[in-house]
C-alpha cells in the first residue's frame, strides 16, 4: 500500500467516523455490533477471531458469525515468542521450557486457547482453525524501518486519526 496511501486511508476512515477504542476487549465486546449494543460493524481483530467465535458460541453454529478480511496492505503479522534471555541464571530450565512450548501437545492446545497458528511444522491444525485461514501476505515493516520510523508513524497516525 505504501506509507502515504496508508495515512490517506486512515484520514478517510476518520472522516467516515472510525472509533478507536481503549483496547481490544472494549472494541470487540462493547463497540463491535456483534456485541450487545455495539454500533460498529467492523473491528480490527485477529485472523483467528472467526474460529474463536464459532468455538465459544453458545448456539450450535456450523459457520462463524463473523469473518476476516485480508485486505492488501492491511495485514500486520503479530509474532509472539519465547526465547532465552542473555545472562539468564536458569538456562537449563529455560531450555526445557522452550522445548515444552514447542511440543506438539502445546502447539495444538495453543490453537484453541491463545488462537495462534502452530509454529512447528507438522503440527495438525485444530478443527476450529479451518475457519481461521492464515493470511497469505502480511505487510510487516522491517525491524530497521520500525526502529527508524516507528515513533514518527505513531505520532503521525495519532495526528491523522485521533486529533
Describe each region flagged by the PLM.
Residues 2-74:
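Ligand-binding pocket segment of bilobal, Venus flytrap-like solute-binding proteins
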Residues 4, 19, 116-117, 132, ...:
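Short coil/loop linkers at secondary-structure junctions
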Residues 5-8, 23, 27, 31, ...:
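Extracytoplasmic/secreted proteins, especially bacterial periplasmic and envelope-associated proteins
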Residues 14-18, 33-37, 55, 89, ...:
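Sec-exported extracytoplasmic/periplasmic mature domains
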Residues 20, 24, 76, 85-90, ...:
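Extracytoplasmic/periplasmic, Sec-exported soluble proteins
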Residues 46, 64-95:
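Internal helical hairpin/lid segments
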Residues 80-141:
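Mature extracytoplasmic/periplasmic domains
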Residues 127-163:
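Extracellular/periplasmic bilobal clamshell ligand-binding domains
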Amino acid at each position: 500500500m505504501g506509507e502515504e496511501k496508508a495515512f490517506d486511508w486512515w484520514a478517510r476512515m476518520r472522516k467516515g467516523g472510525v472509533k478507536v477504542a481503549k483496547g481490544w476487549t472494549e472494541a470487540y465486546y462493547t463497540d463491535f455490533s456483534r456485541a450487545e449494543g455495539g454500533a460498529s460493524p467492523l473491528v480490527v481483530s485477529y485472523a483467528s477471531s472467526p474460529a474463536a467465535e464459532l468455538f465459544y458460541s453458545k448456539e450450535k453454529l456450523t459457520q462463524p458469525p463473523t469473518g476476516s478480511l485480508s485486505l492488501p496492505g492491511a495485514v500486520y503479522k503479530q509474532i509472539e515468542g519465547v526465547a532465552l534471555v542473555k545472562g539468564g541464571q536458569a538456562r537449563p530450565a529455560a531450555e526445557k521450557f522452550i522445548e515444552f512450548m514447542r511440543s506438539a501437545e502445546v502447539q495444538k492446545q495453543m490453537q484453541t486457547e491463545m488462537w495462534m497458528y502452530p509454529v512447528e511444522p507438522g503440527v495438525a491444525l485444530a478443527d476450529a482453525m479451518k475457519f481461521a485461514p492464515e493470511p497469505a501476505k502480511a505487510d510487516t515493516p522491517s525491524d530497521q524501518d520500525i526502529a527508524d520510523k516507528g515513533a514518527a508513524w505513531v505520532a503521525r497516525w495519532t495526528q491523522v486519526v485521533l486529533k
